[in-house]
Amino acid sequence: MIKVLWFLSVPAHLTLEQFEAWYLNTHTRIAKGMEGMRRYAINRALRRQPLFVNREQPLTHRIAEVWWDDVKTVEVCFNSPGGLADLGDGVSNIGIKSDSLPVILFVEETEHPVGEAVGFNLTSSTYLGRDFLVKLVGLLRLPDEADLDTWYARAASRLSQMMGLRKHVYGRVSGETMKIGHVITWPPGGKPVYDRVIELWFDSVEAIDMAFASRQGKEFLDGLKQLGVTPDWVAMRNQELFFSFPANQPLEE
């Protein structure tokens, strides 16, 4: 299964309130009708980011996550009426200027076991019908000489024992592209902006601060630095909306 990530910032011609009203009341309703979609979740950046991130503003305002069987299925969707309706709604409200085009990534994920895992599966089986947990997303560009995958395979087990970590996912960004109609290529420009995606889930931003002040957190960041990798980090409030196809998963409160 492939996960598609959309990064959505608030364009200059909309206020935050206007963007949220459109996105939550109109766009997500259209998105639920897209052909072949397996799961759909939306996430919103927290105003208070972890201390080690050291950014005045979050990297992006929202990240939408949508799962399909493969990239070809995504292409079929966005050349169908439902996908074109979603795309058209986005273009007509966000615009098509270069500073408002979303980052789009096709991600193949591997989940690692953690020492303090949540007691339910977050992407299959049962799930909660409300927002919960904080997801720290790390977006990585790889130097040509960096063998991050080999290093990460060795480091993952120690990282998974980080204090307060509830879920740990490592994603490789696919180099595949897709065409929409005759003129649009995804990812925009035909090349993804990032090469890897790390997801580390915690109970709160404060839990993230404690984890990255620990030995494991410092060792992890130092290891990335030695490889010449400087991730872009953003902490998100997870799953304000979660929709699954087919709808055969029991809803828990």
Where do the language-model regions lie?
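Macromolecular interaction modules
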Residues: 1-253
